[in-house]
Amino acid sequence: MARNKLVSGSHGIWKYFNPAFYLRRPRRLALLIILFVSVSMVVWDRQSLSRDYQFEVSKLNEEVLRLQQMLEEIKSVTEDVSVNSLKDVQEDPVDAQRMQRVKEAMVHAWSSYEKYAWGQDELQPQTKDGVDSFGGLGATMIDALDTLYIMGLDEQFQKAREWVASSLDFDKDYAASMFETTIRVVGGLLSAYDLSGDKIFLEKAMDIADRLLPAWDTQSGIPYNIINLKHGNAHNPTWAGGDSILADSGTEQLEFIALSQRTGDPKYQQKVEKVISVLNKNFPADGLLPIYINPDTANPSQSTITFGAMGDSFYEYLLKVWVFGNKTSAVKHYRDMWEKSMNGLLSLVKKSTPLSFTYICEKSGNSLIDKMDELACFAPGMLALGASGYSDPAEGKKFLTLAEELAWTCYNFYQSTPTKLAGENYFFNSGSDMSVGTSWNILRPETVESLFYLWRLTGNKTYQEWGWNIFEAFEKNSRIESGYVGLKDVNTGVKDNKMQSFFLAETLKYLYLLFSPTTVIPLDEWVFNTEAHPLKIKSRNDQVNLKQSNKVLLRKPAFRIRQRHYGRITKK
């Protein structure tokens, strides 16, 4: 009974799978068709959605790959962005126009040198010939290399590079200045190497540096200041009474430390750091050293103390080696010496009457001399660069204020003459403010150097305006058809016959950078030597080749820039 019921039930189920069941009943057939179509549509829709989903996923994957490729391309381009391509990145149209004007001035100076003095040390524009002021070391050629590179003058840079590779020869029977050869030639070659990565510049820098090394072979380690490049005989100038000069002996540290870093050979760094160690043993309480030092005993003579000629860059390098050394404990003694010297500097600072120009005196014995060289106008830039390193913010602010006041004085060295170009030095007499002493102008860079630093570190556009006024004065008074010349007298405008190599290395470079984006040679990545040759900051003991790290990347400014504003410092 139960079995028959199960069979009957099973037969009842299977009848729905029999087509005759539906053919005999049209309504059932219609329902079946509708059901079939509905199921088919559902299945098809699900398959369609699946295909659409897969298609969209595929498209998204392709887009991800495309974006990854774009990112890689951007990274590749960014890594290859040198200062050459940064010339197109501007902060405002006025800066762009002024950069172009300065660049055109560089092209004029360089093409004149190329036409009339190629391969010689310096151009004499009036007579349209060259002169070997530095023994035929190609001073202008080497001094201008990094300026050409920074301005994106690729063709000129490559032609100069070929000359360096094929014609630059240091095997000369010539008594070279240690100081000038280091800051111009060693510094210029190292900067060209750091910027371009071209090893020919490093090889040449090693060649000339090796020829200078015997100058440090003295009883104290204080170097002689003159050396024969061929024979290695070193001595001091007779007019110095056998003494070494402070600036000439203490302005090789940046270049030779950099050379040791880039070659892995410590001998260069050891020579120059011994000088600082020796001087630091008996460093005076006020941090101020006379300009003459005995190379045998390292004792200073009773001579002038100055931040002008023969003293200036010693103090500059105490600060810059600290910056170049990443401000680590290994170079802390440089900073300590510099801060001590800056406290001593305060004892040399006076104000004129009636206009209260702040100036730096020279010191002879216990007497202050109311005289300031234009060379000392590097000091505002140095003070601005060092101000942020004080542990006490109030101290930093004090020295930044001093920097701004001194810059105003230096700018007025220019504005106080009929040509609007500064004389070589100035005297400050009570009741008459400043008066020009030695009245020539040889295209010096120190004031525009300080304006560059102050612009970068404060954002005050007034410093750009001052720099532009100085540039226009050079254009009006010093530019001639065959280059640029100095003035024999800034009062009359009578021209001389020399285009100094530092005009291309320093004056035009700092003017160009004064109007360039702050990402071009950022101050937290590069240190300028005293000839304005930028050297790349790296780990002090890291001997890795810099070629891959020499790219100047698009990035935020080196320092936190204050809001840009106008207005010179007001005088109380």
UniProtKB/Swiss-Prot annotation:
Activity regulation: Inhibited by kifunensine and 1-deoxymannojirimycin, but not by swainsonine.
pH effects: Optimum pH is 7.0. Stable from pH 5.0 to 10.0.
Pathway: Protein modification; protein glycosylation
InterPro entries noted in UniProt: 6hp_glycosidase-like_sf (IPR012341), Glyco_hydro_47 (IPR001382), Glycosyl_Hydrolase_47 (IPR050749), Seven-hairpin_glycosidases (IPR036026)
Reported cofactor(s): Ca(2+); Mn(2+); Mg(2+)
Transmembrane segments: 28-45
EC number: 3.2.1.113
Phenotype of the disrupted gene, per the record: No visible phenotype; due the redundancy with MNS1. Lack of complex N-glycans, shorter roots and increased lateral root formation in mns1 and mns2 double mutants.
Gene Ontology biological-process entries: carbohydrate metabolic process; N-glycan processing; protein glycosylation
Glycosylation positions in this chain: 326, 460
Catalytic residues, chain numbering: 180 (proton donor), 312, 424 (proton donor), 446
Record topological domains on the Cytoplasmic side: 1-27
Cofactor binding: number and manner: Ca(2+) or Mn(2+). Mg(2+) can be used to a lesser extent.
Thermal response of activity: Optimum temperature is 25 degrees Celsius.
Catalytic activity: N(4)-(alpha-D-Man-(1->2)-alpha-D-Man-(1->2)-alpha-D-Man-(1->3)-[alpha-D-Man-(1->2)-alpha-D-Man-(1->3)-[alpha-D-Man-(1->2)-alpha-D-Man-(1->6)]-alpha-D-Man-(1->6)]-beta-D-Man-(1->4)-beta-D-GlcNAc-(1->4)-beta-D-GlcNAc)-L-asparaginyl-[protein] (N-glucan mannose isomer 9A1,2,3B1,2,3) + 4 H2O = N(4)-(alpha-D-Man-(1->3)-[alpha-D-Man-(1->3)-[alpha-D-Man-(1->6)]-alpha-D-Man-(1->6)]-beta-D-Man-(1->4)-beta-D-GlcNAc-(1->4)-beta-D-GlcNAc)-L-asparaginyl-[protein] (N-glucan mannose isomer 5A1,2) + 4 beta-D-mannose; N(4)-(alpha-D-Man-(1->2)-alpha-D-Man-(1->2)-alpha-D-Man-(1->3)-[alpha-D-Man-(1->3)-[alpha-D-Man-(1->2)-alpha-D-Man-(1->6)]-alpha-D-Man-(1->6)]-beta-D-Man-(1->4)-beta-D-GlcNAc-(1->4)-beta-D-GlcNAc)-L-asparaginyl-[protein] (N-glucan mannose isomer 8A1,2,3B1,3) + 3 H2O = N(4)-(alpha-D-Man-(1->3)-[alpha-D-Man-(1->3)-[alpha-D-Man-(1->6)]-alpha-D-Man-(1->6)]-beta-D-Man-(1->4)-beta-D-GlcNAc-(1->4)-beta-D-GlcNAc)-L-asparaginyl-[protein] (N-glucan mannose isomer 5A1,2) + 3 beta-D-mannose
One Gene Ontology CC term in the entry: Golgi membrane
Single GO MF descriptor: calcium ion binding
Enzyme class, first EC level, given as a word: hydrolase
Sections of the chain in a coiled coil: 51-81
Predominant place of localization: Golgi
Pfam families: Glyco_hydro_47
Topology, Lumenal side: 46-572
Similarity annotation: Belongs to the glycosyl hydrolase 47 family.
Protein name stated in the entry: Mannosyl-oligosaccharide 1,2-alpha-mannosidase MNS2
Species name: Arabidopsis thaliana (Mouse-ear cress)
Organism lineage: Eukaryota, Viridiplantae, Streptophyta, Embryophyta, Tracheophyta
